[in-house]
């Protein structure tokens, strides 16, 4: 085998071609390496970009999910607060309603008790009783009548001769229930001073000449027509 110098001396053109080919091969290899490195770098950069974008998207998605969870938590808190306010309002309303009902019941009871008391006073305050009768026979005389119209509880406006149940025309000794059966005009032993038939001893059950029905006031009794005098 000949050396490089010998071959160059014999065929210089061939040697030059080989050198050029070697240069192309080396240059192509370098370019290939550079290209591979560039591709790897670009892939690395692209991968990093993809990872970054993926992380960003993941973060956004996670944040959205966290936001949803927070919103749900806030909704629960809001519902609890609304429920608490509603329960408090119901309790206050029920308490107020109970107080109003109790107050109304107290007022009704007070009104009923007041009505009963007023009725008792009216029933007990009857001034038309036989014990308080101011028209006593012991003080009754035609000349000295102490039963004036001002004290007469039976007003004269209601007295009429037509309604007189103890009229002088009908007051005979046989029908007189005021112990007139023993009284006579000529032998009158029932004097005013000894008259024992006072209204204070007359009970309401036997007294048929009560003040409530007595329409024969003294102002219309005259001595001339009085046949039933004490």
Swiss-Prot record:
List the biased-composition ranges (Acidic residues).
126-140
Q: Where is this region: Disordered?
A: 112-230
Q: Where in the cell is it found?
A: Secreted
Q: What are the entry keywords?
A: Glycoprotein, Secreted
Question: So which tissues is this one expressed in?
Answer: Component of the acid-insoluble organic matrix of calcified layers of the shell (at protein level).
Give me the glycosylation sites of this protein: 17, 132, 139, 163, 170, 225
Name of the molecule in the record: Aspartate and serine-rich protein
Q: Which organism is it from?
A: Lottia gigantea
